Amino acid sequence: TTGILVGIGETRWDRIEALEAIATSHARYGHVQEVIVQNFLPKPGTAMHNAPACPPDEYLDAIALARVILPPEIHLQAPPNLSDDFGVLLDAGIDDWGGVSPVTTDHVNPERPWPALELLTSVTVERGFTVAPRLTAYPEFVCDPNRWFDKGLHFAVMDRSDAAGLGRDDPGAVFPEAIETVSAADGAEVRQVGSESTAWYSGAPVRPVHLV
């Protein structure tokens, strides 16, 4: 992952050169998953707290430049919480919203809350796209673990991803293990598994959920 910050005094040509440098590096190593194009917003207590925010038209132009200059396999990300009208970011060329969370704040920009997932999904679908969860690694990299991951990470990555390399929709996150020791009628102790547990076994009263 790499990226550029737009609106800190650089010129349009500076942005073009930065994006071309990223494209050149990727052509050599094939290692760039995504490029984040972020608009500068002044923050209190910093050296640039009085600097103007990045103009929206310059920001959208930078995103469009990135989409034209970078090869199509490099994903383009922009944070939705730093733009009041984040739908136009899709129009400009992004294909990823980044780490949007319904339970945590943006720790870098806590004053800018994430948009509700329902709104984010609605705006995305209106433009003909689909919202899907992913890991920190993109599907193209997840599906080629021998090249991109240390062997010690293979199980963890594959356990948390689906057949397409996206984030796995695992019912275990909703229904945690529910196992307790009880006494049977004959006095023997047995391990009783709850009806909503993710521990499946022969003769279970419920069928496993299809994850893939």
In which residue ranges do the predicted regions lie?
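Radical SAM/AdoMet-radical enzyme domain recognition
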Residues: 1-2
